[in-house]
Amino acid sequence: MGKAPLASASIMKSLLLVAFAAMFTQASAGEAPWTPLFNGKDLTGWTPKIRGCKAGENFQNTFRVVNGVLKVDYSDYPQWDNRFGHLFFTKKYGHYRLRVEYRFVGEQLKGGPSWAFRNSGVMIHSEAPETMEIQQDFPSSLEVQILGGTGQGERTTGNLCTPGTHVEMDGKLDTRHCISSKSKTFHGDQWVNLEVEVRDNRLIRHLINGEEVMSYSKPQLGGDAHAEALAKVAGDKMLAEGYICLQSESHPVEFRKIELQELAP
């Protein structure tokens, strides 16, 4: 008789574990699957827009696929000549998680700006490549800025830059162009995992190797004439969706996984 309570407790514990496992399975089953945006073979589904060129023109094969890796490569460039570029995925998104694996390799192209050393970005809530002006450097968007360490000192990644946009931080409008995250520094050519969680214009979170390094809300167009023109056409300055694109800023960078999970509104 004295052992009966222990047996009952053991049974209850087992039942609770089964219940929690069932709940987790149901939650997982209710989530959308992760979908690759990059097929590992070619640039199907992606459109380049490089400064000085029309949308769709991949100047000097800047964006290329080699051995299953999407490379931003400048080996065919005669010189930099301010050829800032972006590679746009074909579909707009507003509620999603995005996962990207990236690393910096090689040397910066001669003539590239000093601030662009081991510097690139993943743009979200972006305008379309077709609405960019021919000589426009960056699309109006939110740039999840990715930086590589210089070999000494600290240099965070997963930062935020805001070409043609503003956001709210801690409930207040923040008009700074670039805002540092609280990430670690990643030197050398190691692969880094970037994840971005986007809940239309309510909340956006940046995660590096699984750790949240930044969050903000209420992204909106503003800060230059082009962005204000986009807002006028849209009838609203608030950004609830947009395109995803990868950046080229004069330093070679590689992406080997780009996948997205759509979220319920």
Model-derived features with residue positions:
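Sec-dependent N-terminal signal peptides
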Residues: 15-23
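Low-complexity intrinsically disordered segments
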Residues: 8-9, 22, 32
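Carbohydrate-interacting regions of secretory-pathway proteins
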Residues: 29-265
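Positively charged n-region of N-terminal signal peptides that target proteins for export
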Residues: 2-3, 9-15
